[in-house]
């Protein structure tokens, strides 16, 4: 590692720590090494579960997953925050309590089934310990917002019978509430924890291995080679590389402080305003979570919640994601034109072809993963195979580098490829056998041992990265458990439906505001789970297709990280851009306009998310409806960009910008004759632009 690269890595960790107490590396102390190896064991356990090397009852598997999260999370938080001896001891006590709960769930699994509905005193004690340890871990890791929200739901379950109608319920005994929240599959160990223990953890590990293997460098070099030389190339590199990296990164905020270390200074150096540079990076990094084929962790929870294949979620997200990044590209292009910013020079750009020639093998696991997902395999199977192939490529590369000639290396890769294809006939165990042989071989020489160390570090880093996601999933299960027990979702849903009877648009705005307010203090995953559980059924009752209603909630949960006053992704970019987080947030909202507009358009015309239904599809047919709504969205985004930036080949007068925004708004609105008005205003605007250019050229 060069000194410059080491400095950049250290700077990235320092910035990440401002937003994530677990961002720093494992300390070199004895405690740090113990936690490092505990993280490795955690990852190996999850891989063994995914590959069915270890088969546990679903309830036990979830409990052990949460036990690992607490056992690793508390001590790491104590080290990361520099706690003194008393608080450190308390953290270790809470970690031990979390392990004890997992052990109790495992040992008492069968007796607990027989005692369902009639818990004894130890059940209640361990149930309370489970709730307390998860609440405290979430508070320490993510701040008070999510624990307070979950605490209010818990208080509602215990005391809601004292509220006035229609918010009251029949009342539930303390024992019943504890059993609902701490046992079974509708509380802490509900669907979110199941998804965390399977899909999410596996894909976080997959991303960790790819990052260690050099995927960030590959994405950056390819992006530079493809768009770096074009007008505003520095910002376009940010949009492309951050969006690509966001597809394999579990956190948009982490992506900001990782890729932003390179892209934000690059944009500033080529003339972009600091606030705009930070806004572009924040927008692109958050957009990675909605970009198929490998979307953020929420996509897996959505598929599991809706009971649909992952490919259906990908299909619904495809067109909106393309529009999101097309809008970002358009905005940075206009900003560059307005300020006369050129692309990068040839000397500063790597060759995209050379980058792919050198790192093409890194794309193979991602390609196989995508193929498996699109072929109907479960995300768990696809993620396991993708992770195994990544490990094989990393280890195989280390072995191939020591071979004497190109011919021998070619033969080696052919043989390894044939061995990898054996999983079609013999399953994952064939890949595990090949991996075992590669590990033993790498252990026999120095370069191989260094590669094994990289894999070991990837296992540890992946487990650490999964901690906030897993703990958030466990805690948000409290809300699901309370809503299932009390039927609280029906109360809010009836309110949404009553509003929607008069105006569907007002119902959508209310849901959007709920998502954004919740997202100001809690991560995307619990935000989605809460709002989809409460508002999703209501939107469905109003005639919104199921997957469209969930995508609506999903989008605004992500966009909450760009929305002031909290705007976590923007404040993560602030120290890099050396600009106010609020200023960056306002710029990010402009760049991310598509993210705010497309969900509304999709509700009225589901064809935008490649879904059946809607008046337009019924009138003109499915594919004509898709083409029409995409065209309308593109025109609206183009007009919005021209209005906001104030430039379209030339500076725009204020009245021209007013016409542009009026045309964009009427194209987006789903009211009688608004399309006709929008296209008429667009035609007027186009004539004005044509006349203006004619006068300039004359």
Q: Model-flagged regions — what are they?
A:
Residues 1-114, 124-128:
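Conserved, well-structured core domains of diverse proteins
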Residues 2-33, 318-464, 568-668, 693:
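Long, contiguous bundles of hydrophobic transmembrane helices that form the permeation core
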Residues 136, 140-141, 151-166, 174-178, ...:
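Core transmembrane alpha-helical segments of multi-pass membrane transporters/permeases
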Residues 80-83, 102-117, 141, 161-175:
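Transmembrane alpha-helix boundary signature
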Residues 220-288, 294-301, 307, 524-556, ...:
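Hydrophobic transmembrane alpha-helices that form the pore/transport pathway of multi-pass ion
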Residues 207-211, 242-251, 283-289, 373, ...:
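Transmembrane alpha-helix interface/packing and boundary motifs in multi-pass membrane proteins
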Residues 123-126, 168-180, 193-197, 315-320, ...:
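Loop-to-transmembrane alpha-helix initiation sites
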Residues 121-125, 186-199, 225-238, 270-276, ...:
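Membrane-interfacial loop-to-helix junctions in multi-pass transporters
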């Amino acid at each position: 590692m060069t000194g410059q690269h080491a400095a950049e890595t250290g700077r990235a960790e320092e910035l990440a720590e401002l937003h994530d107490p677990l961002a720093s590396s494992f300390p070199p102390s004895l405690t740090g090494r113990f936690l490092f190896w505990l993280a490795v064991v955690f990852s190996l356990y999850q891989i063994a579960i995914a590959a069915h090397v270890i088969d546990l009852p679903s309830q036990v598997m979830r409990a052990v997953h949460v036990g690992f999260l607490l056992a690793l999370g508390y001590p790491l938080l104590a080290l990361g925050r520099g706690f003194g001896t008393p608080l450190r001891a308390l953290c270790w006590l809470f970690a031990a309590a979390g392990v004890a709960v997992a052990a109790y769930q495992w040992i008492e699994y069968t007796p607990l089934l027989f005692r369902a509905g009639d818990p004894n005193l130890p059940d209640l004690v361990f149930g309370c310990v489970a709730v307390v340890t998860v609440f405290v871990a979430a508070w320490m890791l993510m701040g008070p917002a999510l624990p307070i929200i979950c605490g209010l739901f818990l208080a509602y379950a215990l005391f809601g019978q004292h509220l006035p109608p229609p918010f009251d319920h029949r009342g539930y005994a303390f024992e019943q509430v504890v059993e609902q929240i701490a046992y079974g599959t509708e509380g802490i160990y509900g669907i979110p924890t199941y998804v965390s223990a399977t899909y999410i953890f596996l894909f976080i590990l997959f991303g960790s291995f790819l990052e260690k293997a050099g995927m960030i460098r590959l994405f950056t070099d390819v992006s530079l080679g493809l768009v770096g030389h074009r007008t505003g190339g520095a910002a376009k590199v940010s949009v492309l590389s951050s969006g690509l990296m966001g597809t394999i990164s579990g956190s948009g905020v982490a992506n900001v402080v990782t890729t932003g270390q390179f892209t934000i200074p690059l944009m500033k150096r080529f003339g972009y305003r600091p606030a705009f540079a930070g806004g572009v990076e924040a927008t692109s990094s958050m957009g990675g979570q909605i970009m198929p084929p490998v979307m953020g962790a929420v996509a897996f929870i959505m598929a599991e919640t809706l009971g649909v294949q992952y490919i259906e979620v990908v299909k619904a997200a495809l067109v909106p994601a393309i529009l999101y990044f097309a809008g970002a590209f358009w905005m940075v292009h206009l900003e560059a034109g307005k300020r006369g910013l050129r692309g990068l020079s040839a000397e500063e750009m790597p060759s995209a072809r050379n980058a792919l020639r050198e790192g093409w093998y890194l794309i193979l696991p991602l390609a196989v993963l995508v193929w498996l997902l699109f072929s109907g395999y479960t995300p768990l199977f696809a993620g396991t195979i993708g992770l195994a192939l990544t490990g094989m490529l990393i280890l195989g590369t280390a072995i191939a580098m020591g071979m004497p000639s190109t011919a021998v290396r070619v033969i080696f890769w052919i043989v390894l490829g044939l061995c990898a294809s054996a999983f079609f006939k013999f399953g994952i165990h064939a890949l595990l056998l090949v991996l075992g042989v590669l590990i033993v071989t790498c252990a026999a020489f120095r370069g191989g041992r260094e590669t094994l160390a990289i894999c070991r570090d990837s296992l540890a880093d992946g487990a650490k990265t999964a901690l906030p996601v897993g703990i958030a999933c466990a805690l948000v299960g409290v809300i699901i458990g309370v809503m299932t027990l009390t039927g609280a979702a029906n109360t809010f849903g009836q309110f949404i439906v009553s509003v929607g009877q008069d105006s569907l648009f007002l119902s959508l705005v209310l849901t959007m505001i709920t998502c954004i307010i919740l997202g100001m203090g809690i991560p995307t995953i619990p935000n989605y789970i809460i709002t989809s559980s409460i508002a999703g059924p209501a939107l469905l009752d109003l005639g919104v297709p199921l997957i469209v209603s969930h995508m609506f909630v999903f989008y605004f949960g992500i966009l909450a990280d760009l929305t002031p006053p909290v705007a976590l992704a923007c404040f993560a970019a602030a120290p890099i851009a050396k600009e106010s987080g609020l200023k960056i947030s306002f710029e990010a909202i402009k760049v991310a306009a598509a993210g705010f507009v497309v969900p509304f358009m999709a509700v009225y015309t589901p064809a935008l998310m490649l879904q059946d239904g809607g008046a337009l599809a019924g009138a003109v047919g499915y594919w004509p409806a898709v083409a029409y709504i995409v065209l309308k969205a593109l025109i609206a985004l183009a007009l919005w960009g021209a209005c906001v930036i104030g430039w379209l080949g030339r500076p725009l007068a204020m009245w021209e910008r007013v016409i542009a925004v009026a045309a964009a708004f009427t194209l987006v609105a789903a009211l009688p004759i608004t399309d006709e008005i929008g296209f008429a205003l667009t035609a007027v605007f186009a004539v004005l632009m044509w006349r203006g250019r004619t006068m300039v050229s004359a």
